[in-house]
Every structure is written in structure tokens, then in C-alpha cells.
């Protein structure tokens, strides 16, 4: 979680470091195509998408330090994008939440390359730290931190 162990490998990079003794992340790796573009995220609480945030970082991608170190990233909320793109990201976040059977709160991450929207992942245990995106989006739609936590506790279920 939190992008620990994520590496971006570009053409010409020395990939031998990923198979050297001392590589701390095990024998197997998952490889995905890197998608250039702007990064967005949208939170869902229950059956409602909250907002779209653009995540801006000079670190290359939204890695651990960009997420948890103060000043590691800038969150623009609401994202400064056209309404059609904004609405589509909100729709896709809610659709992903529902399609995966998520309950409570989730957050979907997206990349936009100027033409296509790509869903990167759905976070089913999103952070609640002072730099986390869920509390920011909740505040943006006038849900206080206390109200958010109360809603999460009231709607928690221990069934399968």
C-alpha cells in the first residue's frame, strides 16, 4: 500500500537492480504500462461520489513521500477541468465502488492523458491523516471530519 515498492522504469533504465540480491520486495513483480498525464482522485461515501481532486507532485508520481510528507503534493479541489470530464470521473468512481461491492468509503484514482480516462485503482481503506484526500473531499462538500468518522462508524458492518 501507499505506493511502497512502486518503481517507474523507463526505456533504457538499468533493470538489473530489480533482480539483485537484497531487492526487498520478493521474487515476483507486477508490470503495468505507465500512463502519462494528469492524476485525479474521487471519493465515494455510501452511494455518493464527493468530488474530484487533481493531485500535483514534482516527484514523478504520487509516491509515499508525496502522500505523507507535508508539501509533497498539492491537491486541487475541485479539479480545474471541464465539467464533462469532472462528471465522468465522478460517475466512474461511483460505478467502480458499486461494481466491486465496496461498502462505506472508497477512493478511486485516475490518470487522464488528454484523451482517455484510465482508472488506476480503487482504495478500499483510504487514509484519514491530515494530508489525506478523503477528509479534504468531505470538507469540500461540507462534511466535517467528525461527521465523516461518525458516518463511517454508524455504517460499519461485520457481515460478509
Which residues fall in each region the model found?
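Phosphate-binding site of ATP-dependent enzymes
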Residues: 11-88, 117-118
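ATP-dependent carboxylate activation and anion-phosphoryl transfer catalytic cores
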Residues: 82-160
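Glycine-/small-residue-rich active-site loops that bind phosphorylated ligands and cofactors
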Residues: 1, 37, 125-126
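Phosphate/diphosphate-binding glycine-rich loops and adjacent basic-rich segments that engage nucleotide
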Residues: 1-9, 18
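Short clusters of small/polar residues that mark proteolytic maturation junctions
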Residues: 8, 54, 122-124
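Short, solvent-exposed polar/charged micro-motifs at secondary-structure junctions
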Residues: 5-6, 39-44, 158-159
Amino acid at each position: 500500500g501507499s505506493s511502497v515498492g512502486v518503481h517507474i522504469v523507463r526505456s533504457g533504465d538499468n533493470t538489473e537492480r530489480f533482480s539483485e540480491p537484497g531487492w526487498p520486495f520478493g521474487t515476483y513483480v507486477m508490470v503495468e504500462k505507465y500512463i502519462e498525464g494528469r492524476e485525479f482522485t474521487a471519493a465515494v461515501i455510501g452511494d455518493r461520489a464527493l468530488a474530484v481532486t487533481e493531485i500535483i507532485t514534482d516527484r514523478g508520481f504520487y509516491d509515499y513521500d508525496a502522500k505523507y510528507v507535508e508539501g509533497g503534493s498539492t491537491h486541487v479541489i475541485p479539479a480545474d477541468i471541464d465539467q464533462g470530464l469532472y462528471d465522468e470521473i465522478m460517475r466512474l468512481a461511483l460505478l467502480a465502488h458499486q461494481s466491486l461491492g465496496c461498502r462505506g468509503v472508497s477512493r478511486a484514482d485516475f490518470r487522464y492523458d488528454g484523451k482517455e480516462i484510465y482508472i488506476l485503482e480503487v482504495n478500499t481503506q483510504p487514509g484519514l491523516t491530515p494530508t489525506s484526500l478523503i477528509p479534504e473531499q468531505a470538507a469540500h462538500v461540507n462534511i466535517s471530519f467528525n461527521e465523516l468518522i461518525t458516518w463511517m462508524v454508524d455504517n460499519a458492518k461485520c457481515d460478509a
